[in-house]
Amino acid sequence: MLAVVEQGSKQYLVRKGQVISVEKISAEPGKEVEISCVKCVLDEEARPHFGVGTVKAKVLAQERGEKLVIFKKRRRKNSRRRNGHRQYVTILRVTDVTL
């Protein structure tokens, strides 16, 4: 089964066994979390079920993502600024998708 879940401010298309990287969740590695904000679930016959279902996932790690570089330049002024940051992310393995 496939499911569209919303975690943080993003939506992910997930299936059982898939590893995804989402915005930080306050849970220790090894814990089981339940994602209740499920937008759509596709069953085996590809019929959509909207607004129902749950997705369970296991927390694999708490990490930091890749560096995002912000570069601002004002043309003809010899003025530029380079800045960057790394977001905290949680690595999840989807263990179950149910209706």
From Swiss-Prot:
Family: Belongs to the bacterial ribosomal protein bL21 family.
GO MF terms held by the record: rRNA binding; structural constituent of ribosome
Gene Ontology cellular-component terms listed: cytoplasm; ribonucleoprotein complex; ribosome
Disulfide bridges in this chain: none
Summary of subunit composition and partner proteins: Part of the 50S ribosomal subunit. Contacts protein L20.
Protein name, per record: Large ribosomal subunit protein bL21
Keywords of the record: Ribonucleoprotein, Ribosomal protein, RNA-binding, rRNA-binding
PANTHER family xrefs: 50S RIBOSOMAL PROTEIN L21 (PTHR21349), LARGE RIBOSOMAL SUBUNIT PROTEIN BL21M (PTHR21349:SF0)
Role this protein plays: This protein binds to 23S rRNA in the presence of protein L20.
GO-annotated biological processes: translation
SUPFAM superfamilies: L21p-like
